[in-house]
């Protein structure tokens, strides 16, 4: 109530969320205390660097309704994984944020029929690729304006990097010639859209790991992903 009646409009409210994985007693709390100012209004310039595994996901964010209308957000219909677009495309329109250090959302993962289950994601890989390409398009199209806000651009670029990694490792995990070709095509698409962004991503740790040659290289890629799953607690 206090924020709603203030002189500045609150564009995005952020809170913690908890991964609760089926069969595991330990819960993984995703919080932002060392990244965002706590319980006060702030802007992108006030944010610290987002570490790997800490991103603003749908479980942790509430946008101002008018902002979503003004930014023209339109999610693809009959498509899974569009939550990545939901927490990506409105960001250039976000000026004022507030971080509520409370475990507000509990995300239950690990069920076999869940949309983020690895096997299910591989079966819907074309939808994951579609979302990834839309994110590439959006970042490249907005880049000239985004680079003026260094912290915002860095965050959006890093978030696209993790989505590229997820798409790549799922295609590698499938292992079919068709899916390996789709992985190659996805990286070529990024290269065609923005060669500088492609080189930054391709020469990074995650991009390099996802593009190691041969069967042995692909095995290393998957093992690296498994380690990240254990470290960050995601599905």
Describe the predicted segments one by one.
Residues 1, 73, 91-94, 100, ...:
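Gram-positive cell-envelope targeting signals
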Residues 1-98, 105, 109-122:
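Donor-binding/catalytic cores of nucleotide-activated saccharide
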Residues 9, 22-37, 47, 126-130, ...:
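Inter-domain helical "communication" segments and dimerization helices
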Residues 75, 142-151:
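Inter-helical turn/loop segments and adjacent helix faces that build the functional surface
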Residues 102-111, 117-146, 163-166, 173-196:
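Catalytic core of nucleotide-sugar-dependent glycosyltransferases
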Residues 150-158, 180-184:
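Short, charged, amphipathic alpha-helical segments
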Residues 154-170:
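Amphipathic alpha-helical repeat scaffolds of TPR domains
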Residues 172-235:
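Membrane-interface aromatic/basic loop that binds lipid-linked glycans or pyrophosphate carriers
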């Amino acid at each position: 109530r206090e924020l709603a009646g203030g002189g500045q409009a609150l564009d995005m409210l952020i809170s913690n969320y908890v991964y609760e994985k089926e069969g595991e007693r330990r819960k993984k709390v995703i919080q932002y205390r060392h990244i965002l100012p706590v319980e006060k209004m702030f802007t992108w310039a006030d944010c610290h660097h987002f570490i790997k595994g800490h991103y603003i996901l749908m479980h942790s964010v509430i946008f101002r309704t008018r902002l979503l209308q003004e930014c023209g957000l339109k999610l693809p219909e009959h498509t899974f994984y569009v939550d990545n677009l939901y927490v990506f495309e409105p960001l250039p329109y976000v000026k004022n944020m507030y971080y509520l250090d409370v475990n507000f959302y509990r995300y239950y993962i690990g069920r076999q029929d869940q949309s983020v289950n690895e096997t299910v994601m591989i079966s819907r890989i074309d939808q994951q690729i579609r979302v990834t390409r839309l994110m590439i398009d959006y970042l490249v199209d907005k880049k000239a304006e985004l680079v003026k806000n260094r912290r915002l651009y860095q965050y959006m670029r890093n978030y696209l990097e993790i989505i590229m990694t997820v798409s790549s490792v799922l295609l590698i995990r499938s292992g079919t010639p068709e899916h390996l070709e789709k992985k190659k095509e996805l990286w070529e698409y990024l290269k065609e859209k923005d060669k500088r962004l492609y080189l930054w991503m391709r020469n990074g740790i995650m991009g390099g790991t996802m593009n190691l040659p041969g069967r042995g290289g692909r095995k290393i890629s998957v093992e690296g992903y498994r380690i990240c799953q254990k470290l960050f607690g995601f599905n």
